[in-house]
């Protein structure tokens, strides 16, 4: 599959892996690791990405939630041609176009975004949640199911137990036991969220599942090829 570099997401990129890595290093310098989330957030959003047609189509699911009840208010699925093949460490270049399309479908701007993927817990400190945050300017957190970079001590067995993930002596995220007898999640800030804020928001949005509600609902939507989770009562369906 060829790499397609058209559009503002890839402005200035010649399609090479080396330049993509250089762009990641440059964009990582723009990541803000302090809390700029509203003191009284009203809307959260969860995003997840999947692929169809043998990888030729990228599918991004977006769920807008009430920040207080964690009930879904809107669900959307965006599909775009896949821009490049899978390259380890460059997932954001593959997923970002579809995520931006899904974001554009939301009728309201979320106060905080949760993305299924890495934030700064990435070899070059720019996973998909960090890349998305820098491009959109939205506060963003990454929640991944597997470690990509760094090392950590196994957290305790109880829900909420956590240990820092370290890379080169610096903390890049948390290993969070979100559910007993489940592997820990990899939680890291993406943009405009602190290390403690990323952990705190994940704990606040957990229910009885392994994933926090924003990415759990987005994962359901993405994995069911457009089938929507139940929306809050009296909420209009928006497409």
Curated annotation (Swiss-Prot):
Enzymatic class: hydrolase
Any one Gene Ontology cellular component term annotated for this protein: cytoplasm
EC nos: 3.1.21.7
Top-rank taxon, per record: Bacteria
GO annotation terms (biological process): DNA repair
Record flagged with keyword DNA damage: yes
A Pfam family reported for this protein in Swiss-Prot or TrEMBL: Endonuclease_5
Binding site for Mg(2+): 48, 116
Keywords on record: Cytoplasm, DNA damage, DNA repair, Endonuclease, Hydrolase, Magnesium, Metal-binding, Nuclease
Reported function: DNA repair enzyme involved in the repair of deaminated bases. Selectively cleaves double-stranded DNA at the second phosphodiester bond 3' to a deoxyinosine leaving behind the intact lesion on the nicked DNA.
HAMAP family associated with the record: Endonuclease_5
UniProt record similarity statement: Belongs to the endonuclease V family.
Name listed for the protein in its UniProt record: Endonuclease V
Lineage of the organism: Bacteria, Pseudomonadati, Pseudomonadota, Gammaproteobacteria, Lysobacterales
């Amino acid at each position: 599959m060829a790499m397609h570099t058209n559009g503002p997401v890839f402005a200035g990129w010649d399609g090479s892996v080396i330049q993509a890595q250089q762009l990641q290093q440059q964009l990582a310098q723009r990541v803000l690791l302090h809390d700029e989330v509203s003191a009284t957030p009203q809307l959260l959003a969860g995003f997840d990405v999947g692929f169809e047609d043998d990888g030729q189509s990228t599918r991004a699911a977006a769920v807008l939630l009430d920040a207080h009840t964690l009930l879904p208010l809107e669900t959307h699925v965006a599909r775009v041609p896949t821009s490049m093949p899978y390259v380890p460490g460059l997932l954001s270049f593959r997923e970002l176009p579809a995520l931006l399309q899904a974001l554009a479908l939301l009728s309201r701007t979320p106060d905080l975004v949760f993305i299924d993927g890495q934030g700064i817990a990435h070899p070059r400190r720019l996973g998909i949640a960090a890349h998305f945050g820098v491009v959109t300017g939205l506060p963003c957190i990454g929640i991944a199911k597997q470690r990509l970079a760094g090392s950590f001590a196994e957290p305790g067995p109880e829900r909420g137990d956590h240990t820092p993930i370290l890379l080169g002596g610096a903390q890049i995220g948390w290993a969070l036991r979100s559910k007993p007898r489940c592997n820990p999640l990899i939680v890291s800030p993406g943009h405009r969220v602190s290390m403690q804020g990323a952990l705190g928001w994940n704990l606040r949005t957990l229910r009885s599942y392994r994933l926090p509600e924003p990415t759990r609902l987005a994962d359901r939507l993405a994995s069911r090829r457009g089938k929507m989770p139940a929306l809050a009562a009296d909420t209009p369906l928006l497409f």
